[in-house]
């Protein structure tokens, strides 16, 4: 972790070489202590954090709605900037610049380190993904969500997408 990496290997070796063996055995890493200190939150902070997470999910829900997305018209950048403006209107800040991208059957929307998506316009049948977080009082959210843009005459996502989501969630549950 970047917060607990202050002692370089050279310095560590120098300290260890200058200490008698009986003291060398007492040297332990403080990394977990530093991480636990940063992770420690008061009950008020946890209440605020839960509210912050709820706000984050509500912003994503609205961003992925027909209020913001018009298939064939709205771009991924339109959604990104709508999210940023929404956060600003609430007096909050984004923790990092949001990412919105699309995935299409038979096509990939993988992008390079420049973050530039190959697809701009969100169409019916697209799977829209976002990575989005807000910050408040040193508390940060980091949420990723998916949404399916219904095709004409569809009332719900196709069965294959529901099954894929279920499998993904099952793996996620197994790993947490």
Language-model features: locations:
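Active-site neighborhoods and metal-handling regions in enzymes and metal-associated proteins
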Residues: 1-176
């Amino acid at each position: 972790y970047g917060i607990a990496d202050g002692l370089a290997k050279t310095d560590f070796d120098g300290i260890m070489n200058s200490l008698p063996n009986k003291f060398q055995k007492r040297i332990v890493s403080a990394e977990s202590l530093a991480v636990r200190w940063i992770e420690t939150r008061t009950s008020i902070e946890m209440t605020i954090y839960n509210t912050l997470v709820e706000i984050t999910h509500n912003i994503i829900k609205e961003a992925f709605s027909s209020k913001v997305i018009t298939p064939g018209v709205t771009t991924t950048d339109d959604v990104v900037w709508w999210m940023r403006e929404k956060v600003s209107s609430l007096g909050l800040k984004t923790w990092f610049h949001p990412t919105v991208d699309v995935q299409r059957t038979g096509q990939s929307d993988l992008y390079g380190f420049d973050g530039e998506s190959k697809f701009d316009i969100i169409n019916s049948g697209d799977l829209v993904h976002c990575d989005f977080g807000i910050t408040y009082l040193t508390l940060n959210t980091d949420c990723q969500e998916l949404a399916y843009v219904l095709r004409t005459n569809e009332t719900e996502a196709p069965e294959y997408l529901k099954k894929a989501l279920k499998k993904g969630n099952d793996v996620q549950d197994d790993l947490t």
